[in-house]
Amino acid sequence: MRNRIILIAISAACSLTWGADWPTDGANSQRTNFQPDEKILTKDNVKNLKILWKIKLDNVPQEMHSLFPPLIIEKVNTSAGVKQIALEAGISDNLYAIDVETGKLLWKKHFEYPTPERRGRPGDPLCPPGQTATPVIGPPNASGARNLYALAGDGKLHTINLADGEEVTPLFQFGYPNGKSYALNLWNNTIFTTTSQGCAGNPNQIWAVNLNDPLKKVMTFNPRSGGLWGRTGAAVDSSGTAWAPTGDGRYDPANQVYGNGLIGARVEGGELLLKDWYIPSNWIWLQKRDLDMQVTPAIFKYKDRELMVTGSKECRVYLLDTKSAGGDNHQMPLYRTPLLCNEEADFQSAGIWGSMATWEDSKGTRWALTPFWGEVHPAFKPPISYGPVKHGAVVAMKVEQNNGKVQLTPAWMSRDMDQAEPPVIANGVVYAYGNGENTRQAYADRGLADFSPLRIKASTHAVLYALDAETGKELYSSGDQITAFNHFSGLSVANGRVYIATFDSVLYCFGLPGH
């Protein structure tokens, strides 16, 4: 009897500690790309990663986009029992619920609507038609059900039961058709997204809607810039302020123009209002060289402050305070790194792209990580590195105080990666990948020629890596196992599995056999 009680207690403890969800792009509303609940994969066993399964989906790529990072919920009550579900979104207005244990499809949903009159120019990678925003999954309701929120290519927001794919509430308009929205963020029942590149003639702005509002009033703030194209949309701080990079453009605050910077907007009195902003002091030069700010920040607690890190194609990382992003003149960061890469000021194949990552280790050290594309800057020499970096890498920095000021201290730089993408940290391991994408947009003999068919043909394949989070040492490489590249996607990590999707609409699940 005593042994039985012990077994029951152990089982109960396991059921309480097992779950590690990934309900939104970037892991959480702060976009930290940190998985705090991973227990299965460790520094010691990650070298044994294998492809547990891969599934070819019927999603049709549009321009260079295909599948987005899957969302993972570990306990979903379905008609076939409790399932761990990977919710995969595809550019062609598709949602797929996949049984994580088997790699089999549980349900699929396709959003049907009349073809919009306006769309981007065919062949233009900047403006694909269809669903461009990673969905978001809300917390369980009183009955334990989970709703997911997805923004279709016609600009309508769908509320769907994760267990069966059925619509839960009437859909409503939350944007314009083919507006190129970015990853949805859910904070206190308010959904945020951003739009960019003026696709199909649509505005570039932050969008918000309160799901509790019976009228579903759509609130926006427009910085009048080239586009808010941070990979994971907006990051939301503890005050509910949504922070998003504004892309290329001018800075003229007297006329409410906030290009080449980072803005923070918050819902107040039924409106989305600008609360603060940061603009680099060299924004004019950044605009001239198309080295815009386009990196979703990662927000974190540090001592008694709430800070954030972001970056730009110039290849610098900026450390900012959410309470005063750029000081009194909005142009003074807490800290700005020297150039990590991009000595040649290349607008297309170098610099920091996408989003950041941050975590705190068991000793209380706060880390900030950034990916970059291209060759490392010759003057940047971190204390630990792993050979020449010609195509991209991940850099880890420690957030430290020095003489009363906060700074970013380089700790390590990873091995060379073919266009390094935003990393994920879980249980002392950094998961990163080179996307294998051909990012070239301009040529000496023909000038600007940014066409999807050219870039797709010249792309190779992605490679997944696992690194020691404290040293950057390579622990695992997928080598040639992944057979296609991906564009503007990302990683998800939960419950001993690492997920990556590719342009050919294949979702890969890596893990340890038997777990």
Regions found by a protein language model. Name each.
Residues 68-74, 86-88, 96:
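General structural concept
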Residues 20-52, 71, 395:
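Blade/loop signatures of beta-propeller domains
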